Amino acid sequence: MDGDYLKALIVFGALLLSMPLSAAQLDLQLGANSRIWQTEELLKHPQVQTLTVKDDVSYKKDMTYRAVPMAALLGGIKPEDHLQAVALDGFAAELAAAPLLNTQGSRAWLAIEDPAHPWPPLSAGKHSAGPFYLVWTDPQAGNISPEQWPFEVASIKRMAPVAERFPALLPDPALKADDPVNQGFALFQKNCLACHRLNGAGDAQFGPDLNIPYSP
């Protein structure tokens, strides 16, 4: 009996792995222009195109995607706005809107995983970067960091800047704008808050708090 049960579990597991991906949805919370996009709708978007990304940050090789320019999806968003892309695993990328709206130089794209043609796993035993992945063409032109390539994206929200949401994180206001402390804070927002919180401040659920319960 135990042997039969084990065989049944193995067969069931194999069936699950062989099942095609199901369609997903992307929640854009943009105020008056909020919308929930389905995979099929995005794959039929009038601006969707086949895009080759050189040396993809997550896959470490050239990748080809069906993708829509982010600027085409961010209706009503202004360059001075602030956005947050939240992934299924709790990664929360803090993104200035201006680079996402670029139509020249570094350009941001939403890559869409087609359930009929799934992407490869990121590594052995892992998921792919889908269902939605923020990718860039010519990222060097805009000094785009790896944290600005969130994958497994579930939602993109317009939010107040980090400094307004978490004022306790702000450096001393008496410091000059070019002070190393302020420069470090800018890097912290861009590179660290995507995964971590600090003293409970931050939205990411991916990595541990950088100071609680232990100060480094």
Predicted regions and their residues:
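Gly/Gly-Pro-rich "capping" loops immediately C-terminal to redox-active cysteine motifs
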Residues: R197-P216
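Extracytoplasmic/secreted proteins, especially bacterial periplasmic and envelope-associated proteins
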Residues: Y65, P69-A72, D179, Q183, ...
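Electrostatic cytochrome c docking/interface patches
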Residues: V162-L187
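The canonical Cys-X-X-Cys-His
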Residues: G184-N199
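Structured, non-membrane catalytic/scaffold regions adjacent to prosthetic-group chemistry
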Residues: A24-A160
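N-terminal signal peptide c-region/cleavage motif recognized by signal peptidases
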Residues: S18-P20
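Bacterial N-terminal signal peptides that target proteins for export
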Residues: M1-I10
